[in-house]
Every structure is written in C-alpha cells, then in structure tokens.
Amino acid sequence: ISAVKEMTVRDALNSA
C-alpha cells in the first residue's frame, strides 16, 4: 500500500 493511499484510507476512516 502506498503512503498516499494509506493517508486517503485513514482520512476516510477518520471522517467516518
């Protein structure tokens, strides 16, 4: 998993 994708997934989970 790329760092950018990890940040995106983390942001999505954080928003949820």
Curated annotation (Swiss-Prot):
GO terms for molecular function: pyruvate dehydrogenase (acetyl-transferring) activity. Its cofactor is thiamine diphosphate. It catalyses: N(6)-[(R)-lipoyl]-L-lysyl-[protein] + pyruvate + H(+) = N(6)-[(R)-S(8)-acetyldihydrolipoyl]-L-lysyl-[protein] + CO2. It is an enzyme of class 1 (oxidoreductase). Coiled coil: none annotated. GO terms for cellular component: mitochondrial matrix. Its EC number is 1.2.4.1. Tetramer of 2 alpha and 2 beta subunits. The pyruvate dehydrogenase complex catalyzes the overall conversion of pyruvate to acetyl-CoA and CO(2). It contains multiple copies of three enzymatic components: pyruvate dehydrogenase (E1), dihydrolipoamide acetyltransferase (E2) and lipoamide dehydrogenase (E3). This is Pyruvate dehydrogenase E1 component subunit beta, mitochondrial. It comes from Solanum tuberosum.
